[in-house]
Each structure stands twice: as structure tokens, then as C-alpha cells.
């Protein structure tokens, strides 16, 4: 029987039991299963304890909670792909129930796309923090929650525009395969997301460059600049470097996924010598689930490194020299301050 004449049940059978497809489904399930406790541990040990401003901390907590929820839904959907074939009694049982597909597909997309857009909110918040460096430590946590709501609203609008008229009335074999009627719009959406992430990454680099210029300028090196402002500038630098690392890592994995899936759809079935192989390649979804686990290790390493540099910077900032001409001046100033305080205390007692 030619592939063009395959029924949906026969197609589901040949796709589901394809060795490469099964290995890919198991990999996505396995890394998602590992990612869930790893993300919880990372959030408890690191993210919830970050010394960053409340606005950025709220954004980062939201980002990693979204990543955890995405790993959870991927663990369920790909676990379904891998384990259900061992228990079915007919080929048609491999077809996913339309209602189950609708909710599984949409929930997976929501928690996949929100973390895609959230790094843009990191950049907006960081630019605001840099602009208000002299007073940002006193700003209450409001911008972060507002940006999260804006991101959710924008993401919901995009997805509604893509799936608003989708009936989900076709047989479905895989939770991540976009219905044919919505595929073109979804492809355009992925391109927009890729452009957005590249632009956001460039903005992060510009932010750090501006910060470096300001930090080296005489305005922030004067002695009359308060220690709190210097600390705030240092905090902006450290937190911006961390968000840059998160943004770049997400861009790397997401860019690989988007480039691969769009290339597969562009070359079509003929390149893969048949519709079955073509569908197998479309159903392979490893890059983004792998990111959910890898970001934990990168996050731990990045924060430990930044904290080490931060502690060294703080120690070098508050250290008082005790040798040479500067050490002698510091000693004289300390003695003078001590006797001035003693004189003031004795005078007040008289």
C-alpha cells in the first residue's frame, strides 16, 4: 500500500513505532521528568533567594515557574506518546482524543511561548533600573508584575489569532504537531519570536555596554556618590549579566528548534523520501525540553560565578588600606574620629 493511501490508523501505527521517533519521544519525556525536580530545587535554592530588586526577581520567578509548568506538560504529553503504544489493542487507539489533544496542545503552547517572550520583559526592567539607578532601590515591586501580565496578554492575543477559528476536528497523532489549518500562521509566529529573541539579545548587550560606560564615567566614580548607588550599579551589572546568560541560552535552544522545524517544513516529504519519515522528523521535539534541564545547570554555575565576583568586588570596595601613605592617612583619620567622639561624649556629660 502506498503512503498516499494510508488510513489515519495505519499512519499512526507506522509513525508511533518508528525507532527514531520512539527514541526521540522517550528522550523528551526523560529530560522533562528530570527537569521538574531540578527546576524546583534551583528555584528554592537560588531564584527565591536572589538579592536582585523585587521587579526583576518577580520576573525571574515567573519565568522559571513557567519553565517548570512547561516541563510538566511536556513530561505528560511525551510520556503519553511513548507509553500508550505498549497498551493499545488496535492501531486506531493510537489516535489522540480530540478533546485531549486540544487542551494538551494549547496548554503546551501557552507554557512554551510565555517563557519565550518573558526575557524581553527582563530587558525592559533592566533599562528602567539603569535609568533610575540613584533611586531604584526604593522603588516598590510593581513593574515586574505589570510586565508579566502584559506578556501573558500579548501571548494570549497571538495564540487566539492563530487558533481562534481552529475546530480541532482532524485525527491527531502527536501533541506538538500543529493542525494544518493553523500551520501557516504558527510558522509566521515562530519567525516573529525568533526575530524578537535576537533583537532582545542585542538589546541586552547594548544595556551592558551602556552600564560599563556609566560605571567608568567620572559621575559614578566621585567620592560624593553614595555607597548605596555604587552597590545598585553593581547589582544592575550582576543581574543583567545573569539575564543575558538566560536569554542567550534560550535563544540558542529555541533558535535551533525553530530553524530545524521550519527547514523540515520547507524541504517537505520528498527530501525525506516519504511522508512517514517527514512526519517522524516533524514529531521530533528535543531541543526545548532539553533546555528545561540544561538551564538549571547553567543557572547554578552562572549565579555561583557572579556571586563570587560580587563578593570579591564588595570586599575590595569596603577594604581600608593599612599600609603606605594612604594607610597612614586612614590611621590618622580613624584616631581623629575616635578622639572627636570621646570629646563630644565628655562635653555632653558636663
UniProtKB/Swiss-Prot annotation:
Biological process, per Gene Ontology: sensory perception of chemical stimulus
Domain of life the protein comes from: Eukaryota
Expression sites by tissue: Expressed throughout the head.
Membrane topology qualifier: Multi-pass membrane protein
Extracellular side: 1-21, 79-103, 163-189, 265-282
GO annotations of cellular component type: dendrite; perikaryon; plasma membrane
Function: G-protein coupled receptor. Plays a role in the navigational capacity of sperm and promotes the targeting of sperm derived from males to the fertilization site in the uterus of hermaphrodites.
UniProt record similarity statement: Belongs to the nematode receptor-like protein srb family.
Name of the molecule in the record: Serpentine receptor class beta-12
